[in-house]
Amino acid sequence: MNEYTIHFGGLAGHSSKPHLGVSAVEYASRYVNKLLEIREELKKRGPKDCIFDPPHSTLSIGGIKGGIAHNVIADKCSVEWETRPVTKADAEFVTNEIDKFANEALLPEMQKVFPQSFIKKEVIGEVVGFDRLDQSEACEFVSSITGDNSREVVSFGTEAGLFQEVGISTVVCGPGSIEQAHKIDEFIELDEIKKCLKFLEGVKDKSVN
């Protein structure tokens, strides 16, 4: 999962003379439209027999912030977005396409009117993907406690990939459901908490023995 905030800087002015200003909001809007085009391309690039749901890399616009009034050309705007690539190639595709558009299409237009115009990319986080392995000490350890030998994949991110990248056998196991995550009144069922406590007791017993 890769998260970014893109900062646009233009030139403020009165809306009656738009040719004398550089609207950061307008250029940010064009940037977002390009992201949406890329998102459609990602759907076509989904690998065959993909085990994820949906079966392709995703891209989402989380927020657009800019402008102070109807009659003022906005000199500042920011776009918050993320992508969840299912392949490394998709991650590179998204980065190359949107950066090229920003630097070669948008920025020259902005700086033609106001040389100090800018587009700055702030990396909020780039989380390494977590691969499902056929053989995993961590999975076998968890299965020995839970009795569940299933192996599932999900389309949301954790820090598991960071541990796996440095050679630590890793598994994601815990209470709750993504269906209740990141929403108003987010919750975990009490039965899930009870299962978690039982699991932790099992971890303790296995560690002692």
Residue ranges of predicted features:
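Metal-dependent amide/peptide-bond hydrolase catalytic core
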Residues: 2-209
